[in-house]
Every structure is written in structure tokens, then in C-alpha cells.
Amino acid sequence: MQAARELLATHRYADISVAAILAKSGAAKGSFYFYFASKEDLLAALVREAVAGGLGAAELWTGTATTTDPAHAVRDGVAAGAHLWRQQAPVLRAIVEAAGTDSKLDALWRNQMDMFTQAALARLDGDQESATWLAGRDPLPIVAALTWLGERVYYLAATRTPPFDTEQAVIDVLTDAWTLALYGRRPEQIAPARPT
């Protein structure tokens, strides 16, 4: 798996062959196919591993008690997400790009993203400040939109696309989006999270 990670750091997923992965790793073809049916299966394993780390990062907000200021927790979670995307950029870039051409990878990515949506919805359950702001509106489409917004902004940061080419810009815009949509307030009074 490490050889694939290293290749993804310098090559587009579509341009990497199983032969290139084998050459980089020094593994035998039979060894590769013992663990993975295809390079898509290898990417899926790398994505699951990265997303597991992402769910841990999201817990800075989703795992907080409702007594914690949610704007602080959102900013901390967004900062941890930005750090994760920076660390896992090659793998996460690859899945975003490959999902558009492979139905199994697309289904996997949608499922992985839905886990973030569901974690955020669970966090909002019983959150009085958000419930007051949302005033009876169904939070699912709002949270799903925010999840996919985050995916796109993190992806643009991973590809170093301005204006999202600095971690602070990513943290600021996503914190604003989440806190304004879910709490109706800007986090200006919050000390900025420092990029990790």
C-alpha cells in the first residue's frame, strides 16, 4: 500500500498501473492479487484507511458535548480535517478524481462522505442552539450540502487551487459556512485555529 501512496504523490491515479505499483514495491504479482482484485480495490482500501482518520478528526466537533461552544468545536474539527487532507492528499485526490469514472469507487466515496453527514447529524441531535436557528427545518440536506462543500474545498486545497491554497483560508471559509448555516452566527469572536 505504501508503494501506491508514493506513486499517487507524483502521478495521477489514472496513469498508475498495477505493474508500476509492483515495480515500486518489489512485490510479486501474485502477492498483489492475493490482497486486491484490482488497483481500484487497492485505492478503496487506502480511502477507507484515510476516512477512518477523517472521522477521528471530525470528532473534535461531532464528539463534543452540547455544552461546548459549537463554533469553537467546528473550527477545531475543520482544522483537523484540513490537516488530514494535507497528509492524505494523494489518496483523497485520487478517489475524488476516480469516482467520476468508476461506479464502485463512486459508491464507496458517497458512502464514506455519508458517514461524515451522519456523524454531524448525530452531533446536532439535542443541540438547542442549532435547533433554534434551524427553526424546524430538516438538517439533513443542510448538513449533506456542508459535507460536500467541505469535500470540494479540501480537494481544491489538496490540488493547491487558489484561493484555497492556504490552510488558514480553508479553515476560515469552512468554519464560516458551517457555523453560519447551523448556528446563524459568525465565529469572529473565536480565536483562529492554527494550522497543524
Where do the protein language model's features map onto the residues?
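Short hydrophobic clusters on alpha-helical segments that form packing/core surfaces
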Residues: A3-L8, A50, G81
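Helix-turn-helix
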Residues: L7-D41, A45
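Short alpha-helical functional segments enriched in proximate histidine and acidic residues
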Residues: L7, L84, A119, R123, ...
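Hydrophobic/aromatic-rich alpha-helical bundle segments in the mid-to-C-terminal region
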Residues: E97, D106, Q128-D176, R185-T196
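Short secondary-structure transition hinges
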Residues: A71-H72, D76, R86-Q118, W133-G136, ...
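Hydrophobic alpha-helical connector segments
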Residues: A45, E59-Q87, P139-L146, I171
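Amphipathic, non-transmembrane alpha-helical scaffold segments
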Residues: M1, L43, V47, V51, ...
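Amphipathic alpha-helical linker/stalk segments
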Residues: T10, L46-R75, L92-R93, L124-G126
